Amino acid sequence: MSSGEPLSETSSSSSSFVPVDQVHLQDAIQVIDENKHFNKDILGYINKTCPPNIGHNYHIVAVFGSQSTGKSTLLNRLFNTNFDVMNEQSRQQTTKGIWLAQSPVLSTSHGHGASKSSILVMDVEGTDGRERGEDQDFERKAALFALSTSEVLILNIWETQVGLYQGANMGLLKTVFEVNLTLFGKSKLESKNNLQSKSSHKVLLLVVIRDHVGNTPVENLASTITIDLKKMWDSLLKPTELKELAFEDFFDLDFHALNHKILQPKEFTAGVGRLGDRLVVENDIFKPEYHHNIPIDGWTLYAEKCWEQIETNKDLDLPTQQILVAQFKCDEVVDTVFKEFSNKFKELFAVIEESPDYENVGALFSDLKSEVLEDYDQVAAKYNQSVYLQKRQKLDDLVNTKLKEVFDVHAKNLLQHSLTKYKKDLVALKGKDFAARSKSLSDEALELVMLNLSHISLSGAFATEILLHQFASDIKAITSQQQFIELNNIVSKAVKKLSQSLSKLMQLQLNDPTEKTWDNILYNFHQLQKEFTSKHNGDFGLNTTEAENENAFAKFKFQSWDAFYQLIHKLITKEKVLQQLQTRFDDKFRYDVNGLPKLYQNSRELEESFAVAKEHALGVLPILTIAKLSDDSEIIPDVDIFTKLLRVKYSASNRVGNYNEEGGEEEEDEDEDEDDDVALNGFADIIDEVEKAEIMAKFRKEIDAKFMETKRSIVQHVTQIPYYIYIIILLLGWNEFMAVVRNPFTFSLAIILGASLYILYTMNLLKPALTVTQRLVDEVIAVGKEKLREVLIDDHHIQAHNLDKMTGKVKVGIHEENAKEDEDATDFLKPKPTQVDVTSLNVVEEE
């Protein structure tokens, strides 16, 4: 397109924005119009004109200079863009605002050359135009915008303007440099002081000297411009903290001269080609420190924010706008990848297993986190490193927070299951080698929990110290609880064993009490106590403390004395004492020293034996009613078993330490009255005086009855038939006796009967035979009574019928009335109380 042809809708003189879908690849787009409005559709233009996914692979070039000095022409010739240029005949402003175009190719000395990176060129409205007159506000803002957003700022001046102040735009540049120093100075100072900082961003001021005749060497012109710029920089009003910053900290200078475009067209074209050659060469003009280090989509946002800050005159540090761009883009990436992660998280952890393979869970955690961070890195790593790392940490925290929800559930289940298993294994020890094996179990449980927590803690991302500390505390509490239970079991078993052994000894001693009975019982009791203490020798093998061991021995002593007390009152009661008195009385009263039954011949012998037996029986009553030793001293325990405080502390109901037991205190309260009653009696008191009086009364009643019974038997023995009477009967009945003996039938019957009795006796069947005989006799008597009852019923019809039955005169064919009467008569045959009628009895006898 020639300079004389109109640009139609793509003309840079148009103040309205051009839609992206109507722009050709060579056309430009207006970034900022003359009304200072920023075009938000720049990114769409770049995406259509530049190669896809250029990322950081781009450069921004801007041009600055007076109006109608050929800025647009230079850009079009050098970068092959299509910016509107001035009409030779009108000499008026053509570029309004700021325009942007993508350079398809570069003009070089060898024709057209392509740069390795995409080049975007900004054509800035010229300064000192008659259209704006003295209004330099837009000029300053446009210059500052170009300086802030570009890598290379082309200062387009004529050779005749070198050395001038206003003509070379030195006044405008001074204002721009002051604002630039104010805005960029703080970050530049920080990066300069921070030796580790990689931020050393600069802007290349490429001074293009136009219409160079050649009389003055370019080096001299460059020296003049350099001196003027540095002098101007030194004259800037710098804040105190920024005075040490030099011109070189912000800018690099480079120079290139071009001949007159019209008078020397070939030389002009050759000069443009030489400049293009430098642009093609890597790291010649486009050096890494000039790049803004943000991707192209971030640069568009950065440019928009820069213009917003410049337009509103907000005194902010513009490099933070780069950070804002990075923050905005990185936040977008974070939201995207975290949303994908959340969806996958819901699918994987919709249902959480109670006992999973924690190593697999930990690997799944790591894979999920690595995947989401890799997705973030692929997109966000091209932005500002500090922001990228900051947002990466934010994403890391979000992922950790989400995964920690699952971690907390797994950790809770792990601790609960581990505690349950540990408690079960601990109980299964049943006290065997408890100290060593419980230590081994606790170490094993802690090691396993620590290992599993490390698997799912994302390499320490989730704190496990508190969980491990709590688990260790719970293990210690369970161990202490089981130690207490095992300790109480040992004490309880020892008390039970003592009680069983002591019970047998006491029963043996109390069967035949003597003055030494309680001495022997107490001695054996102490021996059983010593057996327990010597067996454990101050330690129970449970790894318990010395205080706990002492408390266990004290509990054993208390409970053993309490068991002793309970045994005394179990084995010695009113009924048992009365029974023993009766037994001892019977042993003396009914049997002699050889154990044979006594047969008393007279009352005197009976009375003497009765007195001796009674004295023998009552002799043990003092021994059984109070626990006294042979020295007449009562048995007193080493510990007061009747004190309420000790009974609550050492009682059997407290043997398990009240762990998770309800109602323990209420049970103790219910037994308070009983404890009061026990405390009133004392240990040695077994049977009080009231009970003793009851025993004596019952005993006297029983022995008096036995005395009277025995005395009656003596009287019967005295009044019985004399023995000589039997001799007289034998002599007088001798003939009859011999007649029976001589009769073969009776003699044989007697022999058979005697032999049968002998056989039954030898086979121990005599008693069963007598029982059978007795039942047979009873049955015969019952049948006889029944027959007699039938005869004695007071009814002549029934009597006649019964008599006919007895004589066999009842005929088969009988009248229906007689049959009915017989049915009625059967009701009277049922057993019922009936008085015997003497008249009917006489009738029966007469018949």
UniProtKB/Swiss-Prot annotation:
GO terms for molecular function: GTP binding; GTPase activity. This is Protein SEY1. It is an enzyme of class 3 (hydrolase). GO terms for cellular component: cortical endoplasmic reticulum; endoplasmic reticulum membrane. GTP binds at residues 65-72. Keywords: Endoplasmic reticulum, GTP-binding, Hydrolase, Membrane, Nucleotide-binding, Transmembrane, Transmembrane helix. Its main location: endoplasmic reticulum. Residues 55-290 form the GB1/RHD3-type G domain. The chain crosses the membrane at residues 721-741, 745-765. It is found in: Endoplasmic reticulum membrane.
